[in-house]
Amino acid sequence: MKRAFIMVLDSFGIGATEDAERFGDVGADTLGHIAEACAKGKADNGRKGPLNLPNLTRLGLAKAHEGSTGFIPAGMDGNAEVIGAYAWAHEMSSGKDTPSGHWEIAGVPVLFEWGYFSDHENSFPQELLDKLVERANLPGYLGNCHSSGTVILDQLGEEHMKTGKPIFYTSADSVFQIACHEETFGLDKLYELCEIAREELINGGYNIGRVIARPFIGDKAGNFQRTGNRHDLAVEPPAPTVLQKLVDEKHGQVVSVGKIADIYANCGITKKVKATGLDALFDATIKEMKEAGDNTIVFTNFVDFDSSWGHRRDVAGYAAGLELFDRRLPELMSLLRDDDILILTADHGCDPTWTGTDHTREHIPVLVYGPKVKPGSLGHRETFADIGQTLAKYFGTSDMEYGKAMF
């Protein structure tokens, strides 16, 4: 019986890539800088002391970071016994965004340039805005700028509730984000607006990766909170991923936990499980692992590392999240059968000590564990697609166009 369990710690980079200069990210190091802050006592808010990740260390995380950067992260044990196979991988794709990283993990790198809304003010073309107002019968709109999602809610949330005007905003990523209040605007109405925006972006040839619904609750600035009803409307991958091949060629199953299905535009997904927060995502993953049959992938995205702590530049929160993940990791490992493989990885970096609020161009860890997986270094991987090619070989699907099998 062949089963693979893929856990993406969203934004968990382990050191700047060779091409980081192109992105303004030379020196970025999500893991390294979190560990450094913890070791210096600068991340003691809600947690305390050096970064404590014994289980990830046993799977090779510290060694993978050493391969990427040349040093073991501060406070981590570089001499611990390693029971898994580990690598550090470079991104072939042109961007440092979520779809590019995930698609490349599944064997399909993004070799074209996404479209971006690069102006920080008046970010969106007037023609696009006019069509959205007309088609969705809107009283207008707010925002039309670059912003962090939590900041813009404090700035415009109250006005949105009074006027019914949706909040449009973007970032350095290829995204069009729409924030609306779940109760005063309505969740279904927000989703419908996002569908219209997706259509107009496609019809207008803007080549934008995702439209993201950002629902929130609360009654005034300072207590607005985004909810777990976020929805990403992505374009479809440009070629069949290893997920699609497993379903089509092997009649396999691919279970999405969290936002995986959204990222792949539901392509190659046979079951979707919603969950919000690290513990709930863990619980849902464990349930699906227990029920998984032959030729099954259970694929989970742990988005909080990125959305709650990376973008918000919350070092202590990120560290506490990693430590929670590490404490629960043995629960996953104990469920593995003889032929199973567990892959822990990331899709890009988001260094919480870095300037700004955007992603960082970094190597990702590739930690592979299973009863039959030989421990040790798998070295520097030239593309995340090596993960997809490894899965293609493991499940016996046709080869992926990109990537080399790691074992």
Curated annotation (Swiss-Prot):
Top class in the EC scheme: isomerase
Catalytic reaction equation(s): 2-deoxy-alpha-D-ribose 1-phosphate = 2-deoxy-D-ribose 5-phosphate; alpha-D-ribose 1-phosphate = D-ribose 5-phosphate
Pathway: Carbohydrate degradation; 2-deoxy-D-ribose 1-phosphate degradation; D-glyceraldehyde 3-phosphate and acetaldehyde from 2-deoxy-alpha-D-ribose 1-phosphate: step 1/2
Predominant cellular place of this UniProt entry's protein: cytoplasm
Binding site for Mn(2+) 2: 306, 311, 359
UniProt-listed GO biological process terms: 2-deoxyribose 1-phosphate catabolic process; 5-phosphoribose 1-diphosphate biosynthetic process; metabolic compound salvage; nucleotide metabolic process
InterPro entries in the cross-refs: Alkaline_phosphatase_core_sf, DeoB, Metalloenzyme, Phosphopentomutase_DeoB_cap_sf
Enzyme Commission numbers on file: 5.4.2.7
Cofactor: Mn(2+)
NCBIfam families, per database record: deoB, PRK05362.1
HAMAP family: Phosphopentomut (MF_00740)
UniProt family annotation: Belongs to the phosphopentomutase family.
Protein name in the entry: Phosphopentomutase
Organism: Shigella dysenteriae serotype 1 (strain Sd197)
